[in-house]
Every structure is written in structure tokens, then in C-alpha cells.
Curated annotation (Swiss-Prot):
Gene Ontology MF terms: succinate dehydrogenase activity
InterPro entries according to UniProt: Fumarate_red_C (IPR003510), SQR/QFR_C/D (IPR034804)
Organism: Vibrio vulnificus (strain YJ016)
Subunit architecture: Part of an enzyme complex containing four subunits: a flavoprotein (FrdA), an iron-sulfur protein (FrdB), and two hydrophobic anchor proteins (FrdC and FrdD).
Gene that encodes the chain: frdC
Pfam families according to UniProt: Fumarate_red_C (PF02300)
Identification of the protein by name: Fumarate reductase subunit C
Keywords, comma-separated and alphabetical: Cell inner membrane, Cell membrane, Membrane, Transmembrane, Transmembrane helix
NCBIfam families, per database record: PRK04987.1
Single GO cellular component term: plasma membrane
Family: Belongs to the FrdC family.
HAMAP family given in the database record: Fumarate_red_C
Compartments in which it is found: Cell inner membrane
Primary location class: membrane
Length: 127
């Protein structure tokens, strides 16, 4: 064993606040918290649907609470942020070629958003 002391650089807990890239990364990752609450709310809603009309009405009243509505809006915005970042990464991760030529990145991203809009429209019509 060596007797020398290795240099250990001190890292502050807030090191990520100094870099815009890491701040954005932390913001994007923090959006999972309202999504967890949204998922729990829906799970409780399914349970109350099984329990009967009174439990269902109680859950509907709970979902009408302004705090819950705000959490759901934040969860929606977080989901849209995730979709935006993932869709913008897609052309870099998996470049698409048609007839040997690369497809423009904007077309790939717009096609993904069009697919989301189309599927959302179908869900709205069916439900």
C-alpha cells in the first residue's frame, strides 16, 4: 500500500446550480414528482370506482380541489417538457434516411408531435 494521500476535490451539494445545462437537467428530472402524485391520484380513482358511487363521488370532489388541479397542470407541463426533450433528441440518436438522404430533424420532431396529437384526438373521441 502507498502512504500518499490522494487528492479528493471537494464538491458542494449545489454544484449543479452553476451550470445552465445541469440546472435544466435537474428541473426536467424534478418534474417526475408531480407525475408520481398524478399517478397516485389516478390509482386511488380506480380504487374508488371499484368501491362504488359514493367513493367515486368523493374522489371526484377531491380531484376538483384547486391544489390537485394545480398539481395536475404541473404534471402535464412536466410531461410536455419530457416529450419535447425526448423528441428533440430522437433525430440525433436515431437518424432516419430515405433513399440514402438524411431526413430533416424538424420533420422527424414534427412527425412525432403529429402522432401525439393524432393519438390524443382518437382518445378524446373514444372516451
Amino acid at each position: 500500500m502507498s502512504n500518499r494521500k490522494p487528492y479528493v476535490r471537494e464538491v458542494k451539494r449545489t454544484w449543479w446550480k452553476d451550470h445552465p445545462f445541469y440546472r435544466f437537467y435537474m428541473l426536467r428530472e424534478a418534474t417526475v414528482l408531480p407525475l408520481i402524485l398524478f399517478t397516485l391520484f389516478l390509482t386511488v380513482g380506480l380504487g374508488s370506482l371499484v368501491k362504488g358511487p359514493e367513493a367515486w363521488q368523493t374522489w371526484l370532489n377531491f380531484m376538483a380541489n384547486p391544489v390537485v388541479i394545480a398539481i395536475n397542470i404541473v404534471a402535464l407541463l412536466g410531461s410536455l417538457l419530457h416529450a419535447h426533450t425526448f423528441f428533440s433528441m430522437m433525430p440525433q440518436v436515431m437518424p432516419i434516411r430515405l433513399k440514402g438522404k438524411p431526413v430533416d430533424k424538424k420533420i422527424i420532431v414534427l412527425a412525432q408531435w403529429a402522432a401525439v396529437a393524432f393519438i390524443s384526438l382518437i382518445v378524446l373521441i373514444v372516451v
